[in-house]
């Protein structure tokens, strides 16, 4: 197994210096202690029951940013099932890193296709990691379901480091000897995001996408919308993966483009500019989400239709959807759907297999553990 001491150190530095993000911040001192302990207890009991039932001694924890859309919940369910098939000797657990998604999913922000409000309970990585540790699994894999190794991935690394350093409230401290043994046995692993390796992952994902969308690319532009990070939060300079993916895709067909919601100089208007530089001023544009699931960004920022998604006085506004933007620029825009929804990357078997392979190749977290007790 590879060892990634440098990544842990970089993530630790990031967690100390980065600003607090509303979407995934938490502060134990600001929370009601009883409620906090209850969250740990709920997950501890759930994981203990699962381990007792299965008799398995390995655990896989899948970490997604999250969503509030039912089609995304179903995609997460199928992802978990795929992991259970790929790792028959492990119990598989799922969590969200976004507090906002956790809170809104629990109260039912969106409905299913029949109009029924859908509520789902998800928890932060710290609660599932604590529960897995309390159950004393002998081998733990934590798999990031992020697309790029950026801001959200750094938060995943920080969560694992906190777990290995017993960084919980006093009432939730784990057995320090157990954590030490995980480190000694090299039994705590981190699976990398989808586009982690520019030499391996980027061309593989490009090939998988081309296998799916070559027919569309033969008819017109195929534009993928990723998320990206603003410059301030461009952890590990991961935004470059979107540019690298576009280069790899265009080597297969020049009609592929990759833009983002948040990466500077790679918004929808920048994609249009690159298209026009090649003389593509009309024709078909097929839009696809380059995100793990098709949630709010895919349904609204990418595929939103109608007046609420278009302000002609502010054409390049982030509130204008990609669909309306390209349509009003004179293109024939299509958003392919399955059922009533666009697809996310986890719903594409060839892409999901890249994540699964990352778990199989997961890297041992060297020097993640430090005893909570002072050295004598």
Regions found by a protein language model. Give the residues of each.
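C-terminal motif of bacterial Sec signal peptides marking the signal peptidase cleavage site
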Residues: 19-23
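Extended amphipathic ligand-handling, pore-lining, and cofactor/metal-binding catalytic surfaces
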Residues: 25-376
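Bacterial N-terminal signal peptides that target proteins for export
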Residues: 1-10
């Amino acid at each position: 197994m590879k060892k990634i001491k440098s990544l842990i150190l970089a993530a630790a530095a990031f967690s100390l210096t980065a600003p607090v993000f509303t979407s995934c911040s938490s502060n134990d001192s600001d929370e009601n202690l009883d409620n906090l302990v209850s969250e740990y207890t709920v997950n501890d009991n759930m994981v203990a029951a699962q381990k007792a039932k299965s008799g398995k001694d390995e655990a896989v924890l899948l970490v997604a940013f999250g969503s509030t859309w039912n089609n995304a919940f179903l995609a997460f369910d199928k992802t978990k099932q795929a992991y259970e098939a790929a790792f028959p000797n492990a119990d598989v657990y799922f969590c969200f890193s976004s507090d906002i998604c956790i809170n809104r999913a629990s109260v039912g922000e969106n409905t299913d296709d029949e109009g029924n409000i859908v509520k789902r309970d998800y928890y932060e990585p710290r609660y599932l990691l604590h529960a897995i540790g309390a159950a004393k699994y002998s081998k733990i894999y934590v798999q990031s379901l992020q697309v790029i190794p950026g801001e959200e991935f750094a938060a995943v690394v920080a969560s694992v480091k906190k777990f290995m350093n017993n960084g919980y409230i006093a009432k939730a401290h784990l057995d320090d000897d157990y954590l030490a043994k995980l480190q000694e046995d090299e039994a705590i692993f981190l699976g990398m995001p989808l586009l982690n390796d520019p030499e391996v992952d980027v061309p593989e994902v490009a090939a998988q996408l081309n296998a799916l969308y070559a027919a569309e690319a033969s008819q017109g532009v195929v534009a993928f919308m990723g998320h990206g990070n603003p410059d301030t939060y461009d952890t590990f300079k991961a935004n470059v993966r979107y540019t690298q993916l576009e280069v790899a895709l265009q080597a297969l067909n020049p009609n592929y483009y990759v833009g983002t919601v948040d990466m500077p100089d790679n918004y929808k208007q920048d994609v249009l500019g690159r298209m026009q530089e090649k003389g593509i001023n009309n024709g078909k544009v097929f839009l696809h989400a380059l995100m793990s699931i098709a949630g709010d960004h895919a349904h609204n920022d990418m595929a939103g239709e109608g007046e609420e998604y278009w302000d002609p006085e502010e054409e390049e506004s982030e509130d204008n959807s990609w669909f309306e933007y390209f349509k009003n620029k004179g293109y024939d825009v299509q958003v392919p759907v399955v059922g009533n929804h666009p697809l996310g990357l986890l719903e594409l078997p060839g892409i999901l297999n890249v994540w699964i392979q990352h778990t199989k190749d997961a890297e041992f977290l060297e020097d993640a553990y430090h005893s909570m007790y002072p050295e004598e």
